[in-house]
Amino acid sequence: MSVLEASEIMQLIPNRYPILFMDRVDELNPGESIVVTKNVTINESFFQGHFPGNPVMPGVLIIEALAQAASILILKSEKFAGKTAYLGAIKDAKFRKIVRPGDVLKLHVQMVKQRSNMGTVSCQAMVGDKAACTTDLTFIVGATDSK
């Protein structure tokens, strides 16, 4: 059973189809960690061009999925409720496994440090027991722009 479904996720972050890369939040320990599921299907719009006949999820979109999971982790804290988490930096990104249609991405994000409105998270995108991507992300929390 999930902690947050897609409709609840969309109440927290501004991303929508086709740039919403999570289906549900499976585990959430506010201020500490989150585990999110992204079911990768052949219907994803990016597979039309990446690559025809050899569909591969772009690495930058795996990073985006991890950033979205990190946003949920950050924005579920009382301190940042109603704000927006922005990606500030990507550090040491490594891509270790190709992600294809039919794969289930498990996005694991762990809070490393947080100060004021900035912080760092350690991330892993897993397919089964294999890491598809690992990285550290820096985030900045700001006001939600209503324009």
From Swiss-Prot:
The keyword Transit peptide does not apply. Disulfide bonds: none annotated. GO terms for molecular function: (3R)-hydroxyacyl-[acyl-carrier-protein] dehydratase activity. Pfam families: FabA. It catalyses: a (3R)-hydroxyacyl-[ACP] = a (2E)-enoyl-[ACP] + H2O. Belongs to the thioester dehydratase family. FabZ subfamily. This is 3-hydroxyacyl-[acyl-carrier-protein] dehydratase FabZ. It comes from Lactiplantibacillus plantarum (strain ATCC BAA-793 / NCIMB 8826 / WCFS1). The gene is fabZ.
